């Protein structure tokens, strides 16, 4: 009898623990990098993995260059392979300008392609986490559901090294992907020199 009570108690505790561990997937609950320093963030970043949004998007060989001008304004250029009409691969150049918000890690990013067939828009650009020297995790939600979760998002895992992230950085990034409710939603980005 005592065994049955212990088993029921453990089952109840497990149920309580699992319900308390449910994630809050509302975009407003997502944390970003505290005390973000865009000057330290500037420089070259290689995209190692990405979660795609709806529509045409850079496929692979994605390299981004962030700069901060003398007035503190951040801008970026990115290059990567895009597949058009399901069979035509081209290297696309993208340009972005950033508007600061109250949170130093949250920006509005106006972007456009150098070629007219590329997308343009004005998306959120959040730096979720970075150590500035090894890894960075970017997130953008283009459209919210009524419940505050994201209907159309994209995200990049960046590395300063084109060969990838060290294991300790991979562990941090994986946890932050879970925090964004995007675990197992990313695909690896190859860097094979297509746009070199």
From Swiss-Prot:
InterPro entries: Calycin (IPR012674), Lipocalin_ApoD (IPR022271), Lipocalin_CS (IPR022272), Lipocln_cytosolic_FA-bd_dom (IPR000566), Retinol-bd/Purpurin (IPR002449). Keywords: Disulfide bond, Retinol-binding, Secreted, Signal, Transport, Vitamin A. Gene3D superfamilies: 2.40.128.20. It is found in: Secreted. One of its GO terms (cellular component) is extracellular space. It holds the Pfam family Lipocalin. Disulfide bonds join 25-181, 91-195, 141-150. GO terms for biological process: eye development; gluconeogenesis; glucose homeostasis; maintenance of gastrointestinal epithelium; oocyte growth; positive regulation of insulin secretion; protein-containing complex assembly; response to estrogen. Substrate binds at residue 119. Residues 1-21 form the signal peptide. CDD domains: lipocalin_RBP_like. One of its GO terms (molecular function) is retinol binding. PANTHER family: RETINOL-BINDING PROTEIN 4. Retinol-binding protein that mediates retinol transport in blood plasma. Delivers retinol from the liver stores to the peripheral tissues. Transfers the bound all-trans retinol to STRA6, that then facilitates retinol transport across the cell membrane. Belongs to the calycin superfamily. Lipocalin family. Interacts with TTR. Interaction with TTR prevents its loss by filtration through the kidney glomeruli. Interacts with STRA6. This is Retinol-binding protein 4. It comes from Gallus gallus. The gene is RBP4.
């Amino acid at each position: 009898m005592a065994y049955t009570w212990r088993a029921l108690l453990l089952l109840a505790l497990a149920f309580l623990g699992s319900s308390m561990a449910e994630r809050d997937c509302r975009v407003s609950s997502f944390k970003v990098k505290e005390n973000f320093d865009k000057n330290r963030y500037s420089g070259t970043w290689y995209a190692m993995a990405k979660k795609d949004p709806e529509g045409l998007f850079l496929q692979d060989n994605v390299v981004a260059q962030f700069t901060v001008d003398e007035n503190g304004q951040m801008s970026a250029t990115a290059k990567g392979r895009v597949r058009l009409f399901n069979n035509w691969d081209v290297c696309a150049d993208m340009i972005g300008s950033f508007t600061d918000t109250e949170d130093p890690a949250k920006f509005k990013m106006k972007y456009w392609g150098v070629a007219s067939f590329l997308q343009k828009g004005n998306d959120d650009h959040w730096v979720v986490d970075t150590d500035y020297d090894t890894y960075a995790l970017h997130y953008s939600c283009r459209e919210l559901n009524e419940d505050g979760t994201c209907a159309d998002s994209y995200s990049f895992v960046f590395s300063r090294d084109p060969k990838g992230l060290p294991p300790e950085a991979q562990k941090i990034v994986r946890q932050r992907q879970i925090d964004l409710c995007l675990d197992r939603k990313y695909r690896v980005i190859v860097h094979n020199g297509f746009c070199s």
